[in-house]
Amino acid sequence: MNATTINSLFLIGALLVGASILVSSLSSRLGIPILVIILAVGMSAGVDGGGIIFDNYPTAYLVGNLALAVILLDGGLRTRVSSFRVALWPALSLATVGVLITTGLTGMAAAWLFDLNLIQGLLIGAIVGSTDAAAVFSLLGGKGLNERVTASLEIESGSNDPMAVFLTVTLIDMLASGQTGLHWSLLTHLIREFGIGGVIGLGGGWLMLQLVNRINLATGLYPILVIAGGLVVFALTNALHGSGFLAVYLCGLVIGNRPVRSRHGILHMLDGMAWLAQIGMFLVLGLLVTPHDLLPIALPALGLALWMILFARPLSVLVGLLPFKAFHGREKAFISWVGLRGAVPIILAVFPLMAGLPNAQLYFNLAFFIVLVSLLVQGTSLPWVAKLLKVTVPPEPAPISRAALEVHVTSEWELFVYKLGAEKWCIGSPLRELKMPEGTRIAALFRGQQLLHPSGSTVLEVDDLLCVIGHEHNLPALGKLFSQAPQRGLDLRFFGDFVLEGDAQLKAVAALYGLPAEGIDPDMTLGHFIAQKVGGAPIVGDQVEWNNTHWTVAVMDGNKIGKVGVRFPEGSRPGPGLFL
């Protein structure tokens, strides 16, 4: 490879990445997932488009694994451990039992549609059996889904790769050696994958956390150190025959949920690196496929994709979530629909090619086709389906910007900036009348281009920029303080006619509204009663019906219900609505 060739690679690579970024702006306008657009850019530059010939499967495997490691590290850093209280066990059930059922049902259909033996069909099922972290993290962000649904899908996508990889590798070995039956020893291999991945991921995350917090470096080096550490965890786990994907996700989870030096710098850098990883990975996968090879298998492949989307995935979710009573039918239906496939199936489809199996090209083309259908059908319809199934909750007001204040190595102080519109409650009020959350301070106030020194008598005006020092847990209270005035719109329609305190005595609430109170524990609070009715860990948006009245969890205070919205039957309880 000479200098001219290297320079050409730089030029073509930069043009493709730049084109992907520019064209991605069409994503929100057309309602098409950005990952599909990036795939399309890669395909259009490939054999049937721009003429770039790329058939180096080992390189694609390398790029795919590297990209997924970065994406999962970033996903782990942004996943809150608090979400585990509502979704850990359901997600693990989907990541194991769910993948097995999807693999089996999809494999049997593939064997029938493409005239393959059962083991070959099951290999196809295993390749496309897991949801994809890159697709899930990319498409779920900012959709306003409730915590139970979001956490279940994100944890599932971050933890179901070990099962899919295990099944794929096992079935490839069986086909290569001519085996036709399964052995119980395979179960120990699966447990080893999860066990080694879990131990090294958690241990490596803890070691990286100690290292980052104890060593003094230039600010820009901390994100690079975290990425390097994550890749060490990923590679070491793979070398010990564990699940590198699970390990790097858990490594990010440990670092992201503890006080860590330069948190915002790490998150900002990882955000850019995760986007670059997604773009590079889907460009390479788009270049790898030959579009005209997909045409002969289009109809049976479409049938297989629809079978998986409409039957295999819903049945696997139904069985996987059967023990968990907190999941409503609407939530199960949405989780069934968002079985997003992405880069992982395509990367797994490279395994048979590298092993030299018969029909390996068919497996790859099928995986690519199913991913394309999944992203186009499920990814494009995701916002519409979320609204149809009512799994969204009103968004919490957020500051227009936030930045870390590195007061101490593990300092979690942040600076939040709010812009006050005409509809804000606090306009016209002096600062002394604001009931600021405990532990927060107004640091500065900007009016136009002028920096004001805030005092108790300073009156807030429209378009003021207010800078507040506080912690992340202060955001809900600050959001309510500087939020828009309540409208008889989404918030009131969602939470009900009134919002009551969760620690109100249930018997007193029943007496106040004339509801039957027979058999009620006089000491039970409203929040505890609603939590019992939910049947699991409650979340904002959970709804139950009692005495022909709808009760909705409006605010969570840690693991307790803080506020409950109540909606009476139409016309039976007139009066102004309240939203706190």
UniProtKB/Swiss-Prot annotation:
Gene3D superfamilies: 1.20.1530.20, 3.30.465.10, Regulator of K+ conductance, C-terminal domain
Main location per the UniProt record: membrane
Reactions performed catalytically: K(+)(in) + H(+)(out) = K(+)(out) + H(+)(in)
Membrane disposition: Multi-pass membrane protein
Occurrences of domain RCK C-terminal (ranges): 402-484
Origin: domain of life: Bacteria
Classification via Pfam families: CorC_HlyC (PF03471), Na_H_Exchanger (PF00999), TrkA_C (PF02080)
Transmembrane region(s): 6-26, 34-54, 57-77, 94-114, 121-141, 162-182, 193-213, 217-237, 240-260, 269-289, 292-312, 334-354, 366-386
GO molecular function, one term: flavin adenine dinucleotide binding
Keyword vocabulary terms for this entry: Antiport, Cell inner membrane, Cell membrane, Ion transport, Membrane, Potassium, Potassium transport, Transmembrane, Transmembrane helix, Transport
Cell compartment(s), UniProt: Cell inner membrane
Protein name, entry field: K(+)/H(+) antiporter NhaP2
Organism the protein comes from: Pseudomonas fluorescens (strain Pf0-1)
